[in-house]
């Protein structure tokens, strides 16, 4: 499941109500630079939320050690130490970047299985941008990943689809659909490895016919005149 980390982003709060009132009364006698310098500037910490599933999240900022106040406006994650979990790097305005090591593998070695899927596309899309990766594993669980590396302001993550599996040691099915429409399916893939998938080996996959359901939107133009 995908967790969420939110960077605070702004060194100066232009929506501060006291500043808005102050600007209205002082704008005629102060230069623009003087007004900008008077905007409140307070560092605050970033926020982290753990995905519990079913669209529910727990706020885990303190528990995950994200406590340092900062002005952060970009972030990326990658397995920097190649131990199987994703580490986290955040850019701080006018300050050093922060690097956070993920210790879940060291703390819970039997509950930290993973699968990495590395894509190699064709000559027109070497990285495989836009490819759809879906895995199915224990208890009918599924995870999906639409491959795009961009995260936040001027930030890019490791070009690998990373799936945390918990205690699961074998993935029943890995399905990749490329932008070309072709796809590949892999069965019974062992955890804790990197699966290299090349579009050159993709084929047209059969599609199951799904029952048509009522559309989400209905045309009521005539009713409303």
Question: Model-derived features: where do they sit?
Answer:
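Active-site regions of oxyanion-processing enzymes, predominantly non-cytosolic
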Residues: 2-3
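Residue position within the beta-strands of beta-propeller blades
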Residues: 6-7, 90
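Conserved residues at the C-terminal ends of beta-strands
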Residues: 7-8, 177
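Short, conserved, GDST-rich strand-edge loop motifs in beta-rich repeat architectures
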Residues: 10-40
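Gly/Ser/Thr/Pro-enriched helix-cap/hinge segments flanking short amphipathic alpha-helices
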Residues: 41-52, 56-72, 76, 81-225
